[in-house]
Amino acid sequence: MTSPVNVDVKLGVNKFNVDEEHPHIVVKADADKQALELLVKACPAGLYKKQDDGSVRFDYAGCLECGTCRILGLGSALEQWEYPRGTFGVEFRYG
């Protein structure tokens, strides 16, 4: 029988090359609150975090580039979603 997979361990193997000068995801200044709440629940990397004051904070570093937030929030919560420029982004390492 195999042991359960620990997602944090699997994600920890990935390498992230963050483009500090050009974020590939930009949250709207007047983002729809319900759309942001949905992104908090849906992001598999947990990059959308609800703060104590009820606001939602986002950090694109660590993005898996899966497109979940693009599908759920582009237009309502997100101003921009594009893949990172060449040589930047996630490098999946399976091991």
Curated annotation (Swiss-Prot):
InterPro entries: Fd_FixX. The keyword Ribosomal protein does not apply. It comes from the Bacteria. Coiled coil: none annotated. GO terms for molecular function: 4 iron, 4 sulfur cluster binding; iron ion binding. Keywords: 4Fe-4S, Electron transport, Iron, Iron-sulfur, Metal-binding, Transport. NCBIfam families: PRK15449.1. Belongs to the bacterial-type ferredoxin family. FixX subfamily. Could be part of an electron transfer system required for anaerobic carnitine reduction. Could be a 3Fe-4S cluster-containing protein. This is Ferredoxin-like protein FixX. It comes from Escherichia coli (strain K12).
